[in-house]
Amino acid sequence: YKIPTGEFHLNRCTALLNMFLMATYGEGKYVEAYHDQQIYLNHKLLEQKQLNLTEVQEKSADFLMQFSGVNEAYSAHRLLLGSWTPEIYRIRNGYHRKRSGDLVIDVLPGWTIVSENGNENKVVRHSYIPAPLIFMGHSVKPAIIQTPVTIDHIAPTLAHFMRIRAPNACTSAPITDLR
């Protein structure tokens, strides 16, 4: 099988994005920082040049989509106000509007995200990897459950066992087959 793979260098990507924005809007350092597939734009420079942040984010996302290995590029505006799909839902759950970047890059499966700053490289995998989920405790009966469980079932299940209210952000029901 010939699965398409490659290396995605985020530092090179941000350098090219900054050059694209300079060609479009004039001189300046538009990309302030990047970390963990997120790109942070220089908001002070955008305000100084009286540029619309949403427009710059959308143009940047469209430009990033042209890179090899990029599956999707999401702007902060699209994540906060866009339509809900399973892919956006997964990324939206890890997004915080005050701390996360202006652009989030989703790399194709099989591609390696190369970190020039550190020594760790991240291989992107979107395939299902089965792993056991084990609950142990006084009132937990031994059982094997055949229903699929996602990570967002864990917090409400633990709260259910401890007989406390589930966290406010819980969207899933607890696993009740264990009692």
Residue ranges and their predicted role:
Residues 1-111:
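Secreted, luminal/periplasmic, and some membrane-associated catalytic domains
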Residues 44-51, 141-147, 161-163:
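Second-shell loop/turn segments in exported
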Residues 50-55, 145-152, 169:
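Soluble non-cytosolic domains of exported or imported proteins
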Residues 65-69, 159-167:
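Sec-exported extracytoplasmic/periplasmic mature domains
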Residues 99-100, 108-140:
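C-terminal, low-complexity/hydrophilic appendages and adjacent surface loops
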Residues 105, 133-135, 154-159:
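Beta-strand elements within well-structured catalytic alpha/beta cores of enzymes
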Residues 164-177:
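C-terminal beta-strand edge segments of enzyme domains
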